[in-house]
Design a protein with these regions (language model features):
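Soluble catalytic domains of enzymes that build or remodel membrane lipids, polysaccharides, and related
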Residues: 82, 90-117
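Short, exposed beta-strand "edge-strand" segments with a Pro/Gly-rich flavor and a Y/T-containing core
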Residues: 62-67, 97-102, 169-178
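Acidic/His-rich, divalent-metal-binding segments that scaffold phosphate/diphosphate chemistry
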Residues: 1-92, 96, 188
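Hydrophobic faces of stable alpha-helices that mediate helix-helix packing
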Residues: 51, 104-105, 132
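Hydrophobic alpha-helical scaffolding
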Residues: 44-47, 97, 101, 121, ...
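Conserved, well-folded catalytic cores of nucleic-acid-processing
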Residues: 61-64, 84, 100-101, 114, ...
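Alpha-helical scaffolds flanking conserved acidic
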Residues: 67-78, 106-110, 123-128
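Terminal helices and disordered tails flanking the catalytic cores of nucleotide-processing hydrolases
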Residues: 1, 34, 88-92, 115-194
């Protein structure tokens, strides 16, 4: 469906059926009583709240970018799910949990790609979750440590984008410079109401 959005403008019946099936699975995974989500909530209220924030902002960004809102929302919600296992490599643990709970490949890929430790983001939604997590986490850290004063939202977001782009973070995502600029603008203007 990423190819469809970027190139053809219309979905074939097969692509539409696949998209509908994916969204059906994602809707179930996003249910408040989904077993793995309950495990996350029981494990750590702080991690649960963080994940809910990343989920909400990622969904808004995906809507702004014309991406799959449910995929970005689920990706944000489960991006650090592996932490509930206590494993030192929470990404591998998260991928394993995703497979145990029969997550769609697209969602498992976001868990694997959200921090660049294993893979670079290969979709718009994975890039969104990565940037949302980085921006929200950095902003929270600066606020808690008393270092936020004097750091404008624009400076924070631009610095994170510049740092990530200099490391080739989006080189496999298929995003154009125009899309990258639009995503950066979302975080500055819409998310932070800058």
């Amino acid at each position: 469906y990423v190819f469809y959005r970027q190139h053809s403008g219309k979905m074939t019946e097969t692509e539409l059926a696949k998209q509908q099936e994916l969204n059906k699975k994602l809707s179930l995974i996003l249910e408040a009583d989904f077993g793995l989500l309950l495990r996350l909530q029981e494990f750590s209220g702080q991690l649960f709240i963080h994940s809910m924030t990343i989920s909400s902002v990622s969904a808004q960004a995906a809507r702004h970018m014309g991406g799959n809102v449910l995929l970005a929302q689920a990706g944000g919600l489960y991006h650090e799910i592996g932490r509930i296992t206590g494993a030192s490599n929470y990404i591998d643990a998260g991928v394993k949990l995703a497979e145990e709970y029969d997550f769609p490949k697209e969602l498992t890929d976001i868990i694997r790609q959200h921090s660049m430790r294993h893979e670079k983001p290969k979709s718009l939604e994975a890039a969104i979750v990565l940037f949302t997590d980085c921006i929200v986490s950095t902003n929270e850290y600066l606020e808690k440590s008393g270092q936020k004063e004097g750091v404008s939202t624009q400076k924070l977001v631009e610095g994170i984008f510049q740092n990530r782009l200099s490391k080739g973070t989006l080189s496999e995502s298929g995003l154009s410079q125009q899309q990258i600029d639009k995503l950066q603008h979302f975080y500055i203007k819409q998310y932070f109401n800058g």
